[in-house]
Design a protein with these regions (language model features):
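C-terminal (or distal) subdomains of carbohydrate-active enzymes
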Residues: 165-170, 204, 216-225, 231-233, ...
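Acidic, His- and aromatic-enriched active-site or binding-groove loops in soluble protein domains
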Residues: 100-113, 170-185, 195-198
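Alpha-helical scaffolding within the catalytic cores
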Residues: 67, 94-103, 184-195, 223-236
Length: 869
């Protein structure tokens, strides 16, 4: 039935496009002064809370959209677009009697569900799988509940667009992505191109809330005001490709309502027709604009530029603040994906009841956690913690507990109860990186040592995507020793200053090449030379900040412990404002990674804290992790073939890498410290942006008060980028093996193997199928291999939603070509089915009982919460 419905929709779109093409053709051939202006009214909130709680925000959102729906009812010339599933749920919960009317207007084409994604997320801070699920589940929800399939990636409030968005958009079967900031092409329409060659139409006509005089006036516009509108439209014409109609995303600032003057837009359109008969203004949905322009784009009658890669970034504070939020989200992301994977194995191999409903609800709360202001950290404190309203902490806690519960349950099904220790490796490659066990025992056969806090540091070879259990042994305790003059490992010689505790030298083996130009892992507290706008939104780059203090300014007390696996250096001392700091550095004997754990306390308001790593050689190229891949750009050495953005403060997912002149490079890994910047040859990782209040609202998740702990790491290497396997090492740092206590000893079994050029981000069940998603991770064209040792029959290459299938032969070993950074989704017939969760329609079952009254509280408030009494 869904496929038949899709065919009918496509036919209607074809007829609409054909009619629009004919109209557009006559416009192109006619007088140059003839033009059509499409105004697309929209409402832009922060739907999970910005300056008020989640519970109150959804009231404003529901009523504001209903305000637009009222104007559709009252004015036949009005239309608008509606975005975000949680806003639709709010309408369904508070005003269910309006839902049939909404569905009717959607069928009439006067309201459009414009956004395929579940909500308008920040696209730059999550992993790839979370972004893919956000789109796939958003599509599924809207198809199931409203019977329509949105056509767009509606990302109007993202503050920079990464290189993989074209591929994600096309992979979801969408026709265009819409963004409004940092358009580098100068044209409202252009092609966006991803590294794998995927292309999608990019629509970027300006701000998301323009033509404000029409929306904010409470009486008809005067002739002088209409003159200003004419000037505005003329400016829009300049960025519109020749032959294309003009697009305006209409509204009056954030939280825009329908025009305040009740007789607009009807009277405005009529008046404009008298004033300028050659310009037709239509208040429209976005699909009607696309139907008008798409045929001419496809035929080449309208020519547009191409944007390879991504854009620049702004609202730079978003990338460097609230590490508590970003780190917790990152942990949950990896834990949930691991829980799905182990549940899939346990259900197909050991009769485990696959928890489809619980996993779906965990993903839904991940989506809400991806709401822009939540994951940015830029909101009032009530969004993150509130005594009465469902908040970010509630959702993150729910995901964490459910993921751990699922891992334990699936582990118990795969490994029987006993006195051994189980280890689950979700990574699709053989690994031997160090990890910590929160117990006083280690698996037999591993290298291990007991740390000072009683936990155990462990290193052992783990098979790809495997689970096994080992008898336990008591590891030796590490011993206290004086600070060595040189810390020697298999990979480097390192020196730590006995005065400051800085890492002052790092020489690679075998040749002794010095990596550092000056002391590294130095903490620097800084303050902007000036401040424009709220510091939770805007922060100046490092050249425009003054230094307040450095860890080099304070004497250090240093203690050292060592064991068979690692040497740990702990540096304690004073820091800014007479407060304390603690820096832990762990040097592994057999692994090139150096781990850092840094603690500070009570950072003064408006303080930026960074850790700097001055490099001895010139940095030629910069790579940084983005969803499903990496951005790759030139630095000191110009290269027009590299399109990645490298200037200023930029977001990174898990890692950044700096390729050095003469070969080799340095990678910085993080567990939710997403901000990076490089000036000259000195990369920095942002640790904190202390902001006590956000737009006047206290927020303990932004404030510098209290203690703060940061986890990050460095890995230096000689040789080529490809041999360093930086994306793999970053994944290992973020996704350590899962420990399953109290199991029966059993040899490890691998259920998935792949070629080394891909990283698997997801393995889960969907109805009667298994879905596996991976991405080429080295940036090179080649061949990929997948070997799936789970019961299955039949395999297909699909898009991100399971559609557009191409059969694969040769199971259980499958081969297929991959382009650079290509996202690949495979589906396998499972032989049995699990339940397909019903789309969520209310939040009650997820909300703590004490917070249900606030969730259900309704009022007539609409517009901007800032303006509420």
């Amino acid at each position: 039935m869904e496929r038949e419905a899709q065919v009918k929709v496509n036919r209607r779109r074809f007829l609409a496009s054909a009619t629009a093409a004919a109209a557009l053709g006559s416009t192109v051939k006619g007088a140059a002064s003839n033009r059509t202006i499409y105004v697309v009214p929209n409402f832009h909130p922060a739907s999970c809370g910005w300056l008020t709680t989640f519970s109150k925000e959804r009231v404003f959102c529901a009523n504001s959209y209903l305000n637009h729906l009222d104007r559709v009812r009252d004015d036949p010339s009005y239309a608008f677009v509606l975005s975000e599933v949680n806003n639709m749920i709010a309408i369904m919960n508070f005003r269910p009697e309006r839902v049939p009317e909404l569905k009717q207007r959607i069928q009439e084409g006067r309201v459009e569900l414009v956004n395929a994604f579940f909500l308008e997320s920040t696209i730059n801070l999550s992993g790839g799988e979370a972004l893919a699920r956000l789109g796939a589940e958003g599509l599924r929800w809207q198809q199931k509940v409203f019977g329509v399939r949105p056509r767009f990636a509606w990302t109007i409030d993202v503050c920079g667009t990464h290189d993989q968005m074209a591929q994600i958009t096309s992979g979801l079967g969408l026709e265009a992505m819409v963004y409004t900031r940092k358009n580098p092409t100068g044209k409202a329409l252009h092609w966006a191109l991803s590294p794998d060659g995927s292309r999608t139409l990019a629509i970027s006509p300006g701000h998301y809330s323009e033509l404000s005089p029409v929306f904010k006036t409470k009486e008809p516009l005067t002739p002088k005001e209409l003159d200003e509108v004419a000037k505005f439209l003329d400016e829009k014409q300049k960025i519109t490709p020749e032959g294309a109609p003009v697009l305006v995303l209409g509204g009056n600032d954030d939280y825009a309502l329908a025009p305040a003057y009740q007789n607009y837009p009807r009277e405005f359109i009529a008046k404009w027709k008298e004033r300028d008969p050659a310009t037709e203004i239509r208040f429209s949905t976005l699909s009607k604009y696309l139907d008008a322009v798409l045929p001419a784009l496809k035929s080449g009658a309208v020519k547009i530029p191409t944007m390879p890669g991504g854009t620049a970034y702004d609202f730079d504070a978003f990338w460097i603040e609230s590490p508590r939020m970003k780190s917790w989200f990152r942990r949950n992301e990896h834990a949930l994906q691991s829980a799905e994977m182990l549940s899939t194995v346990a259900s197909l191999k050991a009769g485990f009841d696959y928890p489809a409903d619980a996993l779906y609800r965990a993903w839904v709360q991940m989506f809400l956690s991806m709401d822009r202001n939540s994951l940015w950290g830029s909101a009032g404190g009530m969004v993150f913690e509130d005594a009465k309203s469902w908040d970010v902490r509630d959702r993150l806690t729910w995901i964490e507990k459910e993921s751990n519960k699922t891992l334990a349950g699936a582990g118990s099904a795969v490994l029987a109860s006993g006195d051994a220790i189980g280890v689950f490796n979700s990574a699709n490659w053989k690994r031997s990186d160090p990890f910590v066990i929160q117990a006083q025992v280690a698996p037999e056969g591993s290298q291990s040592q007991t740390l000072a806090d009683g936990s155990v540091l462990c290193e052992m070879e783990l098979q790809p995507a495997s689970v096994g259990a080992w008898k336990v042994v008591q590891p030796p305790k590490e011993a206290s020793v004086p600070l060595p003059e040189v810390i020697e490992t298999d990979h480097y010689w390192a020196r730590v200053s006995p005065q400051t505790g800085a890492l002052v030298s790092l020489k690679l083996k075998p040749g002794g090449r010095e990596i550092l130009a000056a002391p590294a892992n130095v903490l620097v507290a800084e303050k902007p030379k000036s401040q424009s706008g709220d510091p939770g939104d805007f922060i100046l780059g490092r050249p425009q900040r003054d230094k307040l203090a450095s860890s080099l300014d304070y004497p250090a007390q240093i203690s050292v412990t060592t064991g068979p696996l690692a040497t740990t250096v702990i540096v304690e001392g004073k820091f800014l404002g007479g407060k304390t700091s603690r820096r832990l550095m762990r040097f592994y004997q057999h692994n090139p990674r150096i781990d850092f754990e840094t603690e500070v306390e009570d950072l003064p308001n408006l303080t930026v804290l960074v850790a700097e790593f001055p490099l001895a050689a010139s940095v030629d190229e910069v790579r940084r992790g983005i969803p499903f891949g990496f951005s790759h750009g030139a630095w000191a050495k110009p290269n027009p073939e590299l399109h990645g953005w490298t200037t200023g403060i930029v977001p990174a997912v898990r890692w950044s890498h700096y390729a050095l002149a003469g070969g080799g490079g340095v990678a910085l890994f993080d567990r939710g410290l997403t901000g990076r910047e490089i000036n000259g040859n000195t990369p920095i990782i942002y640790l904190y942006n202390a902001t006590d209040k956000y737009y006047g609202h206290p927020n303990s998740w932004l404030s510098g008060a209290g203690k703060h702990r940061f986890h990050y790491a460095l890995m230096a290497h000689g040789g080529e980028w490809a041999t360093a396997r930086v994306p793999h090492a970053a994944w290992e740092y973020n996704c350590p093996p899962v420990i399953l206590q109290g199991r029966v000893a059993a040899p490890p079994k691998s259920f998935l193997q792949t070629s080394p050029n891909v990283i698997v981000e997801a393995l889960h069940r969907d109805g009667n199928e298994i879905e596996l998603r991976l991405a080429e991770c080295m940036g090179s064209r080649g061949d990929a291999e997948v070997v799936l040792d789970l019961p299955h029959k039949g395999a297909w290459l699909t898009d991100l939603t399971g559609g557009r299938r191409k059969p694969l032969t040769g199971g259980p070993r499958y081969h297929f070509p991959v382009n650079p950074q290509q996202i690949v989704t495979l589906r396998f017939g499972a032989g049995s089915a699990v339940s397909v969760p019903e789309p969520i329609r209310q939040w009650d079952e997820l909300v703590p009982s004490g917070k249900l009254p606030a969730l259900h509280e309704y009022s007539d408030q609409k517009g901007h919460p800032r303006d509420a009494a």
